[in-house]
């Protein structure tokens, strides 16, 4: 099946994404990796009137150490967790668990934020 028609927006900043989300709170869905959302749309289980694609927002894709804490952005790919030395050093359980998330192709697209939101 194909998804129902929808508008597609690719904001370049968090502020642009928030404006779109505020204007279309009840009808928009956020697209990160798409592993859960796209199949649900194809089966028309989910029929948003708008997709807000966060993939151009580089401010959400990071791994950094700051003030003795490890910070991971919501758009950081699961594959990054598997190979980033800072993750291995500071979050070894996360690093060891990541290869068990689906197949490498899925980890290449899946984001840490999407994984958390999907479980929520």
Predicted regions and their residues:
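C-terminal structural segment of proteins
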Residues: 1-120
């Amino acid at each position: 099946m194909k998804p129902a028609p929808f508008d597609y927006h690719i904001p370049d900043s968090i502020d642009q994404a928030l404006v779109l989300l505020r204007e279309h709170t009840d009808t928009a869905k956020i697209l990160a990796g798409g592993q859960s959302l796209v199949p649900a749309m194809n089966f028309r289980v989910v029929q948003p009137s708008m997709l807000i694609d966060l993939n151009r927002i580089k401010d959400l894709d990071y791994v950094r150490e700051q003030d003795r804490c490890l910070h991971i952005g919501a758009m950081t790919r699961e594959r990054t967790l598997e190979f980033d030395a800072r993750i291995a050093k500071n979050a070894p359980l996360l690093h060891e668990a990541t290869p068990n998330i689906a197949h490498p192709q899925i980890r290449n697209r899946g984001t840490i934020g999407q994984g958390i939101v999907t479980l929520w």
